[in-house]
Design a protein with these regions (language model features):
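N-terminal pre-domain/capping segments
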Residues: 1-74, 89-100, 107, 145, ...
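Acidic/histidine-rich catalytic cores of soluble enzymes
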Residues: 40, 90, 96-200
């Protein structure tokens, strides 16, 4: 379907009904327009405390992974997620359990998963703590320990480090082999607003 957002890049591929014929049509269209798709993006909360929402998100993520293989992209960008009722340690344990079968499926199709570092705490339903725990090098290390897969890496977005007042260059050295995809966009820090409400 067509997205409701009013900026570019959000009209979606219907992964639920994608088959090899439709995938080939998309690839031919991209070739004709001289563009490539770097990744399929899907950003749900697969650690949601609502187990029905969690299952729905995981089921669709599996379809996105399959579509990425059909389209010969072999990369999906997403969030690890967060259960807002749990602390970070318990969320890490939950992530290990929830993501293991997702990664096994991705590996079976030769599709890599790149986790974005956006905290997702911008709206009332995302507060407090946001909907994604994978926001910092300290947490990445723990995730990669619990999920030691060559198919799990990062969709690195330096803008989220900037507004959190973190060094966005330093992680590039330690995690260079885990950076599968990069989001580039501009950012402006509103210092007056930050002085009023802080970075969280």
């Amino acid at each position: 379907g067509k997205a409701e957002r009013k900026y570019a890049g959000v009209t979606h591929i219907d992964v639920a009904n994608l088959d090899s014929v439709k995938a080939d049509e998309i690839l031919q269209y991209c070739k004709k327009k001289n563009i490539t798709i770097s990744a399929l993006a899907y950003y749900p909360n697969v650690l949601d405390e609502d187990k029905e929402c969690r299952k729905k998100s995981i089921d669709h993520l599996m379809k996105v992974i399959q579509a990425s293989a059909l389209l010969k992209i072999n990369l999906v960008t997403t969030f690890i997620g967060r259960n807002k009722n749990l602390n970070i340690t318990d969320n890490l344990e939950l992530a290990g359990n929830v993501w293991k079968p997702i990664l096994e499926y991705a590996e079976s199709l030769n599709v890599k998963i790149a986790i974005e570092n956006c905290p997702m705490l911008f709206t009332e339903d995302e507060w407090p703590g946001g909907k994604n725990i994978a926001v910092s090098p300290a947490i990445w290390r723990e995730l990669f320990k619990r999920l030691p897969s060559e198919y799990l890496g990062l969709n690195f977005d330096p803008s989220h480090f900037i507004w959190q007042e973190m060094d966005y260059i330093r992680p590039l050295y330690e995690f260079k082999d885990k950076i599968f995809h990069v989001h580039y966009k501009d950012i402006r820090v509103d210092k007056e607003a930050r002085n009023e409400v802080g970075v969280l």
